[in-house]
Amino acid sequence: MEQNSVLLDTSFFIRLLNEEDPLHENALGYFRYFLEHDFVIKISTIAIAEYCVRGDVSELPLKNMLIVPFNFDHAQRAGKMIAEVYAEKKKRGATIAPRAVVPNDTKMFAQADVEPDINFYGTADVECKKVYDMIKTSEGKLSFDFIDITVPYNNVFGVLDFEE
């Protein structure tokens, strides 16, 4: 049986590590589920950099995760992905500046798509779902599924959540 692997973004860790956040319980539920079901949990160097803007790297549960450095293959894939997004936005009437910038969520999507073992991408950023959907529509499919943690893990994975 193939082992599941998930790449988690910055917004996931912000929710996981802030007990006051409205999505903290959802993030905690997912993290527990991933650990209990032997998921390989991954974090991008991009997410680490974003987290360190307001947090400290020592706060991240790195001992439970593998770090995915952003590399040459990821960069090429990210450029192709954002070109597709810009083309779709242009079709919808948006004006695109001549100098393209690749947003960090698209870079992490590229990592999830290029790395052969990653089959899930977890985030609390519902806006990046629009980008994911545009890329998926343009290409027909991506190699990973999108997990929106505003939806509890038991709904996504179809399990009963028994209180302990």
Features from the language model and the residues they span:
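Acidic catalytic patch
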Residues: 46, 66-99
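Conserved glycosyltransferase catalytic-site signature
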Residues: 10, 45, 101-109, 125
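Active-site regions of enzymes building and remodeling cell-envelope glycoconjugates
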Residues: 60-69, 137-141
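Short, well-structured N-terminal submotif of metal-dependent ribonuclease cores
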Residues: 1-42, 52-65, 150, 154-164
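A generic structural signal for short hydrophobic patches within well-formed alpha-helices
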Residues: 13, 48, 75, 128-129
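Acidic, PIN/NYN-like endoribonuclease modules and their adjacent C-terminal/linker elements
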Residues: 1-3, 115-164
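Acidic, metal-associated active-site segment
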Residues: 98-120
